[in-house]
Curated annotation (Swiss-Prot):
Belongs to the SmpB family. Required for rescue of stalled ribosomes mediated by trans-translation. Binds to transfer-messenger RNA (tmRNA), required for stable association of tmRNA with ribosomes. tmRNA and SmpB together mimic tRNA shape, replacing the anticodon stem-loop with SmpB. tmRNA is encoded by the ssrA gene; the 2 termini fold to resemble tRNA(Ala) and it encodes a 'tag peptide', a short internal open reading frame. During trans-translation Ala-aminoacylated tmRNA acts like a tRNA, entering the A-site of stalled ribosomes, displacing the stalled mRNA. Its main location: cytoplasm. PANTHER family: SSRA-BINDING PROTEIN, TMRNA-BINDING COMPONENT OF TRANS-TRANSLATION TAGGING COMPLEX. This is SsrA-binding protein. GO terms for cellular component: cytosol. SUPFAM superfamilies: Small protein B (SmpB). Pfam families: SmpB (PF01668). It is found in: Cytoplasm. GO terms for biological process: trans-translation. GO terms for molecular function: RNA binding. It comes from Roseobacter denitrificans (strain ATCC 33942 / OCh 114). It comes from the Bacteria.
């Protein structure tokens, strides 16, 4: 199960349910947009318990609509009769202008739509942040890892000698 994080004590409704941490390593994110997501009742209750994974999922524009494909929402134990499919396609809610921008972005070579974070906003509504991303090459990933390691070493040195 995913760990549920809360952003602040003043806002009890805001909760990060699932985060795609690998996306920032594998992709160069150009821009991101907050989208609504159409869910069934048992899916919402399962998300509130923290049972979701968006690491293997992606978003796609099909027939003038935006879909979240291959995202996992764990089954809700108390829903016996009206259980949801764990890996079904879920429709994302977005304005027409943003949809056309996404369509144009995915038509460029190497661009894809990657889910970054799934959360409940301050009003308690389930939202997902979708990023327009370009896949990194192996040498770019190595460069990112080297920068991250160097910043860790710098902070350790400053802590030891500071």
């Amino acid at each position: 199960m995913a760990q549920v994080k809360s952003s602040s004590k003043s806002d009890p409704n805001y909760k990060v349910v699932a985060e795609n941490r690998r996306a920032r390593f594998d992709y160069a994110i150009e821009s991101d947009v907050e989208c609504g997501i159409i869910l069934e009742g048992s899916e919402v209750k399962s998300l509130r318990e923290g049972g979701a994974n968006i690491a293997e999922s992606y978003a796609a524009v099909e027939d003038g609509e935006l879909w979240l494909v291959n995202s996992y929402i764990a089954p809700y134990k108390q829903a016996k009769t009206f259980q949801h499919e764990e890996r079904r396609r879920r429709k994302l809610l977005i304005s027409r202008k943003q949809l056309s921008d996404f369509w144009n972005a995915t038509q460029r070579k190497g661009m894809t739509l990657v889910p970054l974070v799934l959360y409940f906003n301050h009003r308690g509504m389930a939202k997902i942040k979708i990023g327009v991303a370009k896949g990194k090459k192996l040498h770019d990933k190595r460069e990112t890892a080297a920068k991250r390691d160097w910043s860790r070493q710098k902070s350790r040195l400053m802590k030891d000698h500071g």
